[in-house]
Amino acid sequence: MKVVLQRSKAASVTVDGTVTGAIDSGYVLLVGITHEDTQEDVAYLAKKVANLRLWEDADGKMNHSILEQGGAILSVSQFTLYGDAKKGNRPSFTSAARPEVAEPLWEAFNQALREHGLHVETGIFGAMMDVALINDGPVTILLESK
């Protein structure tokens, strides 16, 4: 499982002209799921996202988590994180989990974040989405469960 985490000042996701999720300060999470991912991967990355210290303290040191900062999450499923472009010019997505496997794990990940006390907004699984965000920093971290 991979998560591209971007700290943001504001973000939203729109599907067919309708905003399906929006946050003020927090994280935008682009979430990719592969064939081998399990509930253990979900739990590991949800805990990591909740506790990662990416917010500055009074001394300017990244020392506060999103829980301490009071931010929210915008979670967007993104199978293209498992795109392989080593051969040729068209990426292969065979490492991405099939939708019937990926969607329940993405939903479980979002629920695990909520269980950590985070407010979670989402896109729509499998939809073409317009994601807008104002990067904060920018701070962008790639998290992987394996």
From Swiss-Prot:
GO cellular component: cytoplasm
Motif mapping: Gly-cisPro motif, important for rejection of L-amino acids: 137-138
Compartmental location: Cytoplasm
Pfam family for this entry, one: Tyr_Deacylase
Alphabetical GO biological process terms: D-amino acid catabolic process
Subunit structure: Homodimer.
Family, as annotated: Belongs to the DTD family.
Annotated protein name in UniProt: D-aminoacyl-tRNA deacylase
Originating gene: dtd
